[in-house]
């Protein structure tokens, strides 16, 4: 094994004790990788480095990048919205990272007809998936609604049938999270045929600050339910970019350069160039300021 590879393996194990690379893993040739997958990986990592809880890992960016290039399967094109799955694969490869993103959601339902009261087991997830078309539709119907209220409406419409012991009627579900994550992640699902105008209308709905307590019923101190957008993974053609908030302005990371965007209105405007935000990372405001 090359001495430099040994040093990288040892460095990874120091950073995350759960990580281990065997000699075979480290020496396995990468082969021909899919350019879009490699682009997506780079921009997911770039977005993550902009989150404060990962600040201590930034100096090891190249180590993590090299490890994931070898560990993940990046030889085949991503499927539609497949960047979400790649993000989950990263968290699976680096399990300690997942602790910052995980959300345990509890669903409660009281049937309006038979009054059967049900509480479902907590489900673990790492992101909230929202359809881009649903954002546009709800915004069109409720023009004064904020981003978080629009998400609340979308989630409320996800009804569940009354249990087999009840009447079977579809009922609204109250959703609660028992532990606030350090990073609240939203994944936007797109089709491949949105017009530039539809992309613009979708991004216009987004906000840079959200209160998770509007979307869910949250246990604990409500002072910790406010989150601020710090970075986004975006798709532009067949390449991924990272849009991040740095030094009081928004910038866009391309393959080998940084484009200064400016304020949030400018971020929305550049999406007329068919730039689709796909993963949004919101960091807890209180934790970020501490």
Can you describe what each PLM-predicted range is?
Residues 25-28, 35, 43, 61, ...:
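Generic hydrophobic/packing signal
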Residues 30, 105-108, 154-161:
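Processing junctions and N-termini across compartments
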Residues 2-20, 128-290:
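Exposed substrate/partner-binding surface patches
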Residues 27-30, 34-43, 109-112, 184-185, ...:
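Conserved, well-structured core segments
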Residues 2, 8-24, 33-133:
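Papain-like cysteine protease catalytic cores
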Residues 24-27, 83, 98-103, 150, ...:
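Generic detector of short alpha-helix boundary/capping microenvironments
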